[in-house]
Amino acid sequence: MNKKVKKIFQSNEPYIFLIIILLGIVVQIRSGQFFTANNIVDLLSAMIVPGLFAIAEFMALIAGGIDVSFPALASLSAYATTKFLLDKNYEGNVLLAFVIAIAIGAVLGAFNGYFIGYLNLNAMIVTLGSASIFQGIMQGTLRANQLSVIPPGMKSFGTAAFLTATNKANGLTSILPYTFIILV
């Protein structure tokens, strides 16, 4: 084996990848339902939110820091936006929701950036503290609870099918929403 291949197999990642592939093959052999278009669409759909979070964290890592506040920041931005639009009985398209959520996220990100960039505080400590602050704002100030209704524009955007797959064996239909395009 050459040096590159030896170096690759000195880390854990190739073995984890092989285990995942083997598990997929075993499940496919046992059920016949793993490598179906329906399941692949479901897997892609399930990757949207974690994928967006991973991209956001990757940007922080590239910049030389670490951000542990991004789940709380995203939750606060999404909840505050949705609650605001519901309170205003907004029934327009999703573009306004994106603009508001991005603005809230930018302000909260600037809050972190001030302490990290200008005051030279440790990124891990700042974002850990700001995550607690953001969660406190959601639970204390906004009295966050589960929203059973969302504005129509947000709902239609989240449920509009970019791709549909139907499993002929069991009749299940899966949709890949347009939000997948944002991830890609």
What is each model feature region?
Residues 1-14, 35:
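Transmembrane alpha-helical segments of polytopic membrane transport and secretion proteins
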Residues 16-28, 57, 102-105, 131-136, ...:
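Hydrophobic core segments of alpha-helical transmembrane domains in multi-pass membrane transport
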Residues 7, 124-184:
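Transmembrane helix-bundle core of multi-pass membrane transporters
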Residues 13-18, 43, 72-76, 95-103, ...:
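Hydrophobic alpha-helical transmembrane segments
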Residues 48, 52-56, 77-80, 104-111, ...:
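Membrane-embedded alpha-helical core segments of multi-pass
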